[in-house]
Amino acid sequence: MIGKLKGLIDSYGEDYVILDVQGVGYQVHCASRTLQALPQAGEAAVLSIETYVREDQIKLFGFRSDLEREWFRLLQTVQGVGAKVALSVLSTLPPSDLADAIALRDKAAVARTPGVGPKVAERIVTELKDKAPGFASVDPAVAHLSGAIEERSAPRPVADAISALVNLGYGQPQAAAAIAAAARSAGDAAQTAQLIKLGLKELSK
C-alpha cells in the first residue's frame, strides 16, 4: 500500500494531480482545497496517500497532512458517505473547522457541502460526535453545552439565551461560546435575561 508520495507536480485535472515520482506519474485525487494549496507544475510536493484497491482499479487519494487523511477515513465510517462525499466535505471545511463543527453539533456548517443534505449532515455530526473532541479546538465546555442543547437537556435559561443570540444574527457556535462563558460567571441560578446581557458583553470583547 502507498502511504506517501514525494515528487514533482506534472499537471492538474479537475479533481486530481499527476505527481511525477522518479519518472512515474501517479494520478492522485484530492479535495479542491488541497489542489489549490499545491504548487505549480514543475515544483516539488508531498502528499499523504490513501490507497483504494478494487477489482477493476487502484485509486489514490492525496492529502496535505496525515490529519486530513484521518478525517477522510473517519467520514467514510458514516452511513451514506463514500470517498466522493468525504472529499467534498474536506473541500468545504478544513479538518480543524470540521472537527469544531462536529463538536458543536453544527449541522448547518456540514450541510454547506455540495452533495451533502441535512440528513447526511446530521449523521456525520451524530456518528462522529465522540471522535471529534480530540481534534477540535473549541472549549470542551462549549462543545458539551452544544450537545446538551441538541439533546434538549440543557437548562431552559441557557437554551433560551442561546436561541435569543442566534435570533439576533449570531452563529450557533458563537452564541454557545458566549453563553457558556456567561453561565460560568453568573452561576447556576442565572436567568435568561442575565445570560443574554452577559453573553452580549462576551461577544463585544
From Swiss-Prot:
- Pfam families recorded for this chain? HHH_5 (PF14520), RuvA_C (PF07499), RuvA_N (PF01330)
Keywords of the record, alphabetical order, are: Cytoplasm, DNA damage, DNA recombination, DNA repair, DNA-binding
Output a single Gene Ontology CC term carried by this record: Holliday junction helicase complex
Could you confirm whether the keyword DNA-binding appears in this record?
Answer: yes
Give the SMART domains listed for this entry.
HhH1
Locate the region Flexible linker: 144-153
Q: Name one GO molecular function term.
A: ATP binding
UniProt-listed InterPro entries: DNA_helicase_Holl-junc_RuvA_I, Hlx-hairpin-Hlx_DNA-bd_motif, NA-bd_OB-fold, RuvA, RuvA_2-like, RuvA_C, RuvA_C_sf
Give any single GO term for biological process: DNA recombination
The main place the protein resides is cytoplasm
Positions of region (Domain I): 1-64
Which NCBIfam families does the UniProt entry name for this protein? ruvA
Written domain comment of the UniProt record:
Has three domains with a flexible linker between the domains II and III and assumes an 'L' shape. Domain III is highly mobile and contacts RuvB.
* Protein task: The RuvA-RuvB-RuvC complex processes Holliday junction (HJ) DNA during genetic recombination and DNA repair, while the RuvA-RuvB complex plays an important role in the rescue of blocked DNA replication forks via replication fork reversal (RFR). RuvA specifically binds to HJ cruciform DNA, conferring on it an open structure. The RuvB hexamer acts as an ATP-dependent pump, pulling dsDNA into and through the RuvAB complex. HJ branch migration allows RuvC to scan DNA until it finds its consensus sequence, where it cleaves and resolves the cruciform DNA.
Task: From the Swiss-Prot or TrEMBL record, give the protein name.
Answer: Holliday junction branch migration complex subunit RuvA
What organism does this protein naturally occur in? Rhodopseudomonas palustris (strain BisA53)
For this protein's source organism, the top of the classification is: Bacteria, Pseudomonadati, Pseudomonadota, Alphaproteobacteria, Hyphomicrobiales
